[in-house]
Amino acid sequence: MRVRRVVDGEGEQLRALRLRALRDAPEAFGSSAEREAAYAPAVWAERAAGAETVTFVAVDGARWVGMAAGRPDGAVVQVLGMWVDPAARRAGAGRALLDAVAAWAAARGAERLELGVTDRAPAAAALYRAAGFAPTGEERPLPGDPPRVERVLHRSLTIR
């Protein structure tokens, strides 16, 4: 398994992976497979090109088995869309994806990573804690599903 950045021209592969994630864990995301399946090919091409958000994928052979994105927000990089195929879990893909986003963010001068996790994703919360994330104490509405909330976790990228 290796982790690499999604590049321009891989919009269709990114779409297929994202839809798998949304179907596998609809409670973990603020969107739905039905909604995103209707997005135009140009949306996926833009996401793959990484103009605003960078996406990393975990690849096993030729199969994409996981993803995580990073979106800059000042000194913070938001980790978005984190997902690993159930068959590839507990093999290091999740940690490798988080580390790839962290390395990219640190190279951009970011001070920390932030992400949100719902109470319906205890395995994800455990992964984030093991990867050095800690609670901020903040809760925010889950994007796309405002009645639900996600807890905000962060990971420092600076050495003290």
List each language-model region with its residue ranges:
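Internal amphipathic alpha-helical segments of the cytochrome P450 catalytic fold
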Residues: V76, R90, A124-A125
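Extreme N-terminal starter segment of soluble prokaryotic enzymes
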Residues: M1-V3
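Conserved G/P- and acidic residue-centered "switch" motifs that form tight phosphate/ATP-binding loops
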Residues: G92, G109
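C-terminal "cap" of GNAT-fold acetyltransferases
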Residues: E111-E114, T118-R160
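Acetyl-CoA-dependent GNAT
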Residues: R5-A87, L98-A100, W104, R108, ...
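Loop/helix-junction capping segments adjacent to catalytic residues or to phosphate/diphosphate-binding pockets
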Residues: E12, A91, P122
